[in-house]
Every structure is written in C-alpha cells, then in structure tokens.
C-alpha cells in the first residue's frame, strides 16, 4: 500500500526501502501490542495452555496454565505489516510470506494437538512434523531454484564463492530451513530465551539482505549482488518490531508462550533470509545460541544411545544450567549476551573479506 502511494501520489520518500522498513517495524509492533492482550484473555478463557513436560525442572511447574500459541499473533502482525509496506510483486517477499505461513500452519497444528483433549497430547509425532517441514522446505527451495536464485556457496570473511552447488542447492537449502526451524524450536524453553536472539538474528539478516540487494553496497563490500533481495529488509524489520512487542508479554514471568506456531516459522524464515543473502554458513554465527542448543541435544541423545551415558544433566543445554542451580533470569540474560556478541562477530564479515 505504501509503495502504491509512492507510485500514484508521488510521495517520493516511500520509494526508499529504509523508510518502508521503519514503517513496517512500527506497524508490526503496534499491531502485536494491540492484539496480544486480547489473545491472552481469549486463550485463558479457552484454557489454551500447553501441558508442562513431566521431566521438566521443578520450577517449571508454576508455568502451568500459561497460554501458548502467541506466535500466531506476531506472525500475523508481521505478514500484515509486510503486505502494507513491501512490493508484493517482489518474488523474495512472496517467498518470505509463504515460508512464514507454511511453517506457522505446521506449528498451529502441533500446538492445537498439545492443548486439545486428544490422545496425542505431545502434539504431532516427531516423524510427522519432520515430514511436513521437509515438504514445505522442499517447496520453498524448489521455487528459489526455479526462479534462478544463485546456488553458489559463500563462506564468511572470503569474497569468492567456494563452489557452485547446482541442483544440490535445493537439498542444502531444505536442510538450512528445517534445521533452523527446529533449532529455534528447541531453544524456546525459558521465558524470552528464544525471543531476543531471534530479534538480533533478524536484525543482522536484514542488514545482510539489504546489502546484497543494493548494487553499490554489494560491490563496495565485495558481496554478491542479488537483485531485488533488499526488499526483504522490510519484512525482517517487521518481524523485529513484532518480536519486541511480543517480548513485552513473554519476558519473565511470561504471560504467554510463542509455541511451535511461533518458533517454527521464526527459524524457517531465518534460514530463508540466510539463503537469499548467501549467508547460509554465516547463519551458524548469527544463530549461535540456536546452534548451541541443537548440538547439546544431538550430543545428549547420541551419547546415551551409544554409551548409555549423558553428557549434560538435561538437554537442551539451558535445562542443564537450571539443574546446576542457575536462576532462570541469569540463564536468559547470559544467553542474550552470547547472542549479541555472536551477531557482532557475524557483522564483521561485512567488512573483513
């Protein structure tokens, strides 16, 4: 809509991505702040709360009854803000909206299964969830490939591509999207723990897609120039605004959880932005907290299956620190600090190449 105003009413300031990114940020923020209290009241009335895992640390029992599925609100706000401010004839914007929508639907189904009175109180089975995720990721990766998105693989701090992936890029992109989606999902175990690292990651990724989409900046900073990709910075800005508003309600003690309907699309969209920005490997630094949490689970499960011994007191690793006696707030803030530092390191790749 705002770009239409520029085209038809000649409001020139609205042609700039930076301006529309700022507008999308505030639209998503205000919309989430307005809708979230209404959603929380509705969810409490419907008793839409996720059961607490029986093996969770004892202090988690007080979280019983906290509404879940808050992700529906901030994903909805992000999409609305994007529709109002971005060019809807932009291929990458359409792909971003599709990514959020598809993975949000998977999360909604999983959350609904958990809070309903069905026998499957654990939600979708891990196998079914993974199948749906790979099907959605395959659709997105396939569309990117058919559109002609570059399949060159770049590494941080090096200006030349490592190699051309060709059609195998589809498989690689699928794993980036699904892996990122599940990594954020695993991290979402404490109040606000996944929210702030997500805000930081989307801020960094928004800068990166803006750079690769800008011919002058991409050339100066020795990045590949991905035409029209810069428009995705508007969508990244919108999701940051929505998440900051969500943090108002999700900070400790949380009034609402994002649920799988929030964490799955967040992670998938992170992967999508990294693919578009040709920063798939750099995503390991951008989302270091999410990687750390995922690796802790892999090590725990692998060690127990191979040696019948556990590496950590409990996995994901934030539960390990809880079992060691760390207070929830201390764990959360320390993880935020690590996320902040890892994103600063990732941003160094803009200049050091």
Curated annotation (Swiss-Prot):
Annotated catalysed reactions: UDP-N-acetyl-alpha-D-muramoyl-L-alanyl-gamma-D-glutamyl-meso-2,6-diaminopimeloyl-D-alanyl-D-alanine + di-trans,octa-cis-undecaprenyl phosphate = di-trans,octa-cis-undecaprenyl diphospho-N-acetyl-alpha-D-muramoyl-L-alanyl-D-glutamyl-meso-2,6-diaminopimeloyl-D-alanyl-D-alanine + UMP
Gene Ontology cellular component list: plasma membrane
Transmembrane segments: 16-36, 64-84, 88-108, 130-150, 160-180, 198-218, 228-248, 256-276, 281-301, 330-350
Keyword Cell division included in the entry's annotation: yes
Keyword Protein biosynthesis: no
Protein name (Swiss-Prot/TrEMBL): Phospho-N-acetylmuramoyl-pentapeptide-transferase
A Pfam match: Glycos_transf_4
InterPro entries: Glycosyl_transferase_4, PNAcMuramoyl-5peptid_Trfase, PNAcMuramoyl-5peptid_Trfase_CS
GO terms, biological process: cell division; cell wall organization; peptidoglycan biosynthetic process; regulation of cell shape
GO molecular function, a single term: metal ion binding
Listed EC numbers: 2.7.8.13
Membrane topology recorded in Swiss-Prot or TrEMBL: Multi-pass membrane protein
Keywords: Cell cycle, Cell division, Cell inner membrane, Cell membrane, Cell shape, Cell wall biogenesis/degradation, Magnesium, Membrane, Metal-binding, Peptidoglycan synthesis, Transferase, Transmembrane, Transmembrane helix
Family matches, as PANTHER family: PHOSPHO-N-ACETYLMURAMOYL-PENTAPEPTIDE-TRANSFERASE, PHOSPHO-N-ACETYLMURAMOYL-PENTAPEPTIDE-TRANSFERASE HOMOLOG
């Amino acid at each position: 809509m705002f770009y239409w105003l520029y085209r038809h009413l000649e409001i020139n300031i609205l042609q700039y991505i930076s301006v529309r990114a700022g507008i999308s940020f505030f639209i998503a923020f205000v919309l989430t702040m307005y809708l979230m209290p209404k959603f929380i009241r509705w969810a409490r009335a419907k008793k839409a709360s996720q059961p607490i895992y029986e093996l969770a640390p004892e202090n988690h029992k007080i979280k019983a009854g906290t509404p879940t599925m808050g992700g529906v609100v901030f994903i909805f706000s992000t999409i609305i803000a994007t529709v109002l401010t971005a060019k809807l004839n932009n291929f990458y914007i359409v792909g971003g909206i599709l990514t959020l929508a598809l993975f949000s639907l998977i999360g909604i189904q999983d959350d609904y299964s958990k809070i309903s009175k069905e026998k499957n109180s654990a939600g979708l089975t891990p196998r079914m969830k993974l199948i749906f995720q790979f099907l959605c990721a395959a659709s997105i990766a396939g569309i990117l490939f058919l559109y002609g998105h570059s399949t060159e693989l770049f590494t941080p701090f090096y200006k030349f591509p490592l190699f051309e992936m060709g059609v195998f890029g589809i498989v690689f992109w699928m794993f980036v999207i699904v892996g990122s989606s599940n990594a954020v999902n695993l991290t979402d175990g404490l109040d606000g723990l996944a929210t702030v690292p997500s805000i930081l990651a989307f801020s960094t990724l928004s800068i990166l897609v803006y750079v690769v989409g800008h011919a002058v900046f991409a050339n100066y900073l020795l990045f590949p120039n991905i035409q029209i990709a810069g428009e995705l910075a508007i969508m990244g800005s919108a999701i940051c605004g929505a998440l900051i508003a969500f943090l108002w309600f999700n900070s400790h003690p949380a009034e609402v959880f994002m649920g799988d309907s929030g964490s799955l699309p967040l992670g998938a969209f992170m992967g999508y932005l990294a693919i578009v920005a040709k920063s798939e490997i750099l995503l390991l630094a951008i989302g270091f907290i999410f990687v750390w949490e995922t690796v802790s689970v892999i090590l725990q499960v692998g060690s127990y299956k191979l040696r019948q011994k556990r590496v950590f007191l409990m996995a994901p690793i934030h539960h390990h620190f809880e079992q060691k006696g760390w207070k929830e707030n201390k764990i959360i803030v320390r993880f935020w600090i690590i996320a902040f530092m890892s994103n600063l390191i990732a941003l160094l790749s803009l200049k050091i190449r």
